[in-house]
């Protein structure tokens, strides 16, 4: 896999961000967060819930569940 190839994590989060798909994020301590993905990098996710922004460290994330399906398309062959 070369550097220009996106990984599934980036494809998933970017698709949720671009299409404004609401997500539920479960943290490793069991806490549940809901909102829209506003941005992300290698270590964090910015989540917006009714104007309240949260920065979540990815190492604290257990599961991310979208409210509607995330479609994966691979433009590379």
UniProtKB/Swiss-Prot annotation:
GO molecular function: RNA binding
Domain of life of the source: Bacteria
Gene Ontology, cellular component aspect: cytosol
Keyword RNA-binding set for record: yes
Family: Belongs to the Hfq family.
Functional description taken from the UniProt entry: RNA chaperone that binds small regulatory RNA (sRNAs) and mRNAs to facilitate mRNA translational regulation in response to envelope stress, environmental stress and changes in metabolite concentrations. Also binds with high specificity to tRNAs.
Protein name: RNA-binding protein Hfq
Protein's organism: Clostridium novyi (strain NT)
């Amino acid at each position: 896999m070369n550097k220009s190839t996106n990984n599934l994590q980036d494809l998933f989060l970017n698709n949720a961000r671009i299409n404004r798909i609401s997500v539920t994020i479960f943290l490793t301590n069991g806490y549940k967060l809901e909102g829209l993905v506003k941005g992300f990098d290698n270590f964090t996710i910015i989540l917006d819930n009714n104007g309240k922004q949260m920065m979540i460290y990815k190492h604290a994330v257990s599961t991310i569940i979208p409210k509607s399906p995330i479609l994966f398309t691979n433009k590379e062959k």
